Amino acid sequence: KVIGGGPMMGRALVNTEVPVAKGSSGLLLLNRKESTRRPMRDCIRCGKCVGVCPMGLNPAFIMRDTVAKNWDSCEKMNVADCIECGSCSFTCPADRPLLDHIRIGKQTVMGIMRSRKQ
């Protein structure tokens, strides 16, 4: 697996034909064992994701509402303020893909907000 942008904020590359440019912050190469996700478990409500969020968001609740497609609640919880640092996912002892869901919620909510302005 090849990740462009580093271990925390990087994104998996679909193929290796993506060019590396001056602004590229790095490439991370993972073997099969390192790139396999551990199975996700139920949230244990430890609050570690909230404690590490530099924006003061509640990643666990945002993920819950993204899964439920409750976009109004995601907007009220300021999902658009997420800087996508990945600290929440990295810290989660239940191995929940918090950032993946937050990115979906953020993209959807920002689309809704743009359509309101038009």
Language model features: what each stretch is:
Residues K1-A94, L99-Q118:
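Redox cofactor-anchoring modules in respiratory/redox and cofactor-processing assemblies
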